[in-house]
Amino acid sequence: MKNFFSAIGEKIRANRVAVSIIAIVLAIAIVVATIAFVLPDNFFKNLVSGESNQTVVSVDSEPEPEPEPEPDNSFEIKMTFAGDTIIACYKDITSSGSFNEYANKKDPSYFLEKIKPIFEKDDFTFINLENVLSDKKLTPVERDYSPAFWFKSKASNVNILTSSSVEGVSFTNNHTNDYGTAGYNDTIATIKAAGLEYATQTKTVYFTKNDYKIAIICSGLWYEGQSADIIRRVKEASEVSDFQIVFFHGGTEKVHAPDNYKVRAARKIVDGGADLVIGSHPHVLQPREIYNGVEIIYSLGNFCYGGHRRPENRCVLYQVTLNFDKEGIYTGVNSEIIPCYVYTGSVNNYQPAVIENEKEKQRVLDFMDGKVDSPL
């Protein structure tokens, strides 16, 4: 009987072991199935092949600060110069088709409306004003030469300039004293009241942008010896400015070649320290040259010109651009000549405009570079 119960006990223990083994196997199967479900499909394949199946866990960390961009202090200064401007009539006489008739009928913005978009985009626009602005009845001064001309208009004609983004004028020419001291003083007062900068034979215009200062020295240039006084003024201006421009008035009228004395004088002015030299007075274009690295423009021609019904119908705007790098340091200058018509009608309608015709435009550019004898 004892052996009987021992056999039964052994059998029960064996069954328990079998059950335990089965339970363990089932547990392992469940674990494996669970792992297989959550792991990537190629896990076991990679495991067999020996490929790594490690998962890289990204740990959040403080991002490295991006380096601050270097400050960019680059900029440019763009200036536009236009030539002989007479917004008036001979002795202030109004006749059919005259400038005065147009000025009485048209809004001031009419005269320069085709050029204004250029002036609006620059930093400073400067023209040569060749008439008296006064509402007084003044007597023309006597001249000891013939033919002589006197130009005067109502003071409100200054709005032709201010309405079209002109910022400064040279009142340094042979017409500033057409009506004596009274006419001169009235004109200066009108210019100042309009908020325009102005230069005279003794007063220099200064324009500043981002602490860079440009001087515009205006003067008559009727003989070579006048260059000495201009050079003196250039040197004085250089003590308080960074870039010196000379805008002179002189030479023989209605000829396309600059006088020999004017060429010699302009070159002396460059040797005396001027950074740019620009001329006016001939009422026609004269070419430019580069002398010792400095540009000389001998005549810009007319601009808005009320002095004649049929003046030569070519002129230029001269634009100069000074460039500054990221550190705000001056790096050099470049220029552009913009060929224009003095008027756009069959006769003078006192409304200059940019030349669009490519052949006519190129003719003017070739003339200014000395390649042809006439801009027409």
Walk through the language-model features, giving the residues of each.
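N-terminal targeting leaders characterized by basic, low-complexity, disordered sequences
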Residues: M1-K11
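Membrane-interface segments at the starts/ends of alpha-helical transmembrane spans
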Residues: I12-R16
